From Swiss-Prot:
The lineage of its organism: Bacteria, Fusobacteriati, Fusobacteriota, Fusobacteriia, Fusobacteriales. Residues 1-181 are annotated as: Large ATPase domain (RuvB-L). GO terms for cellular component: cytoplasm; Holliday junction resolvase complex. It comes from Fusobacterium nucleatum subsp. nucleatum (strain ATCC 25586 / DSM 15643 / BCRC 10681 / CIP 101130 / JCM 8532 / KCTC 2640 / LMG 13131 / VPI 4355). This is Holliday junction branch migration complex subunit RuvB. It catalyses: ATP + H2O = ADP + phosphate + H(+). Residues 255-332 are annotated as: Head domain (RuvB-H).
Length: 332
């Protein structure tokens, strides 16, 4: 079932999300510290007539890692090639991409933490020395051939930086953490998106959507489209505070951007374990959700807004969450 506040990209929204992506740093809203550092790196590289150092972008999904890779490519006037860790199953898969690169190309590998070790080892000499070692043949007759690669930049993206091996992580010259966006930045993203989509919206309407967007541009753009649909049918076509509130309430997204699944996680810990602590494996079984999905997709936002704590003994619901859900906290 579609989860409207999922940070993950849905297949049916890929094209429209592309249309909303900024093309330059001037259009890119938020991540100011990161933008300044990257802008300096790019200008310095251009001044020296060199490629930018390899870049690692990490942070929760939906914050614009792919978008930023596109912006960097545009600023460098470079071609961008996109792939992902799970797709590159064999060393030959990555070798084929590397040998197709042209000078100054940018290779973007999403979910780079999911590369298997055999594929990952191909990257080491490619990143460090601009060389690709290929084994031709098998057994005693096998030969190693070294191919010189043109200068290129690798941009790796991950939601789990801690899962990267040290040898791979150390080969990135630049490493940046993508931060959640504040409400004002999200509001600006919504107003920009509305303009591109031809949607009428006032500032109060944009603020109401931004408060429920979980600090994530991908979610903000998705909610904007849903509220637009609601206003076209049940409103006057213009998104204001009341129409945005009514639409999002109907969609089950509350004032903190929480949905039924978030509420189920918190309520399950409260009702079954008096608020915790409860181990992640137990919680996974209780909710019928994969452990990795809980850790990577569901928990980060609950932790960010102070509703859930990760402790050595397990997950614990906070007093702030009890107040939000109007539950009576059990003191032990």
């Amino acid at each position: 079932m579609e989860r409207i506040i999922s940070e993950l990209e849905m297949p049916n929204e890929i094209e429209i999300q592309k249309s909303l992506r900024p093309k330059s740093f001037d259009e890119y809203i938020g991540q100011e510290n990161l933008k300044e550092k990257m802008s300096i790196s790019i200008k310095a590289a251009q001044k020296r007539n060199m490629v930018v150092d390899h870049i690692l972008l990490y942070g929760p999904p939906g914050l614009g890692k792919t978008t930023l890779a596109g912006v960097i490519a545009n600023e460098m006037k470079a071609n961008l090639k996109i792939t992902s860790g799970p797709i590159l199953e064999k060393a030959g898969d990555l070798a084929a991409i590397l040998t197709s690169l042209e000078e100054n190309d940018i290779l973007f590998i999403d979910e780079i933490h999911r590369l298997n070790s055999t594929v990952e080892e191909i990257l080491y000499p490619a990143m460090e020395d601009g060389e690709l070692d290929i084994i031709i043949g098998k057994g005693p007759s096998a030969k190693s051939i070294r191919i010189e690669l043109p200068p290129f930049t690798l941009i790796g993206a991950t939601t789990r930086a801690g899962l990267l091996s040290a040898p791979l992580r150390d080969r990135f010259g630049v490493s940046h953490k993508m931060e959640y966006y504040n409400e004002n930045e999200i509001k600006s993203i919504i107003i920009r998106g509305a303009k591109i989509l031809g949607v009428k919206i006032n500032e109060d309407g944009a603020i109401e959507i931004s408060k429920r967007s979980r600090g994530t541009p991908r979610i903000a753009n998705r909610l904007l489209k849903r509220v637009r649909d609601y206003c076209e049918i049940k409103g006057n076509g213009t998104i204001d505070k009341l129409s945005a509130k009514n639409a999002l309430d109907m969609l089950g997204v509350d004032s903190n951007g929480l949905d039924d699944l978030d509420r189920n996680i918190i309520n399950s810990i409260i009702e079954n374990y008096d608020g915790g602590p409860v181990g992640i494996e137990t919680l996974s079984l209780l909710l019928g959700e994969d452990r990795r999905t809980l850790e990577e997709v569901y928990e980060p936002y609950l932790v960010k807004i102070g509703f859930l704590k990760r402790t050595n003994r397990g997950r614990v619901v906070t007093s702030k969450a009890y107040q939000h859900f109007k539950k009576v906290e059990v003191k032990i």
